[in-house]
A protein has these predicted regions:
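Exposed extracellular interaction/assembly regions and N-terminal maturation sites
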Residues: 1-67, 90-104
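Residue-level marker for the onset of beta-strands and adjacent loop->beta junctions
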Residues: 16, 74, 84-86
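Short beta-strand and strand-turn-strand segments in soluble, beta-rich domains
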Residues: 68-74
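Beta-strand-rich interaction surfaces with strong enrichment in secreted/lumenal proteins
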Residues: 75-79
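Extracellular disulfide-bonded cysteine-rich modules/repeats
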Residues: 81-92
Length: 104
């Protein structure tokens, strides 16, 4: 059996538009705009939805450990830059961190 993520989708986040519409995506390449925006994720499709976020080489952005506002339960706030990655799973209520690689 092969586990495969959907084709990568490139997204830019800004301080004015920090929300990422996850939809049925499972692999996002995200880049900031120089303001280090704090990302907000929309809900997952169903329980168990996996989401891999890869930091595009370029300007950083922050994943915030805040279930109420950002729908993310992380080990702490994570600055994504370089080629960092973050793997999340949708619990039905929030995105929960599985792993994080700081690749810079």
């Amino acid at each position: 059996m092969l586990l495969s993520l959907a084709p990568r989708k490139s997204i830019q986040v800004t301080k004015a538009k920090p929300t990422i519409i996850v939809g049925d995506n499972s692999y996002l390449s995200v880049r900031g705009d120089g303001t280090n925006p704090k990302v907000i994720l929309t809900k997952g499709r169903e329980n168990g939805h996996l989401l891999l976020i890869e930091s595009a080489l370029g300007l950083p952005f922050t994943m915030v450990d805040n279930v109420a506002t950002h729908r993310t339960e992380l080990s702490g706030n994570i600055t994504m830059k370089g080629a960092s990655t973050l793997l999340l799973i949708w619990s039905g209520l929030r995105w929960v961190q599985i792993s994080h690689s700081k690749n810079f």
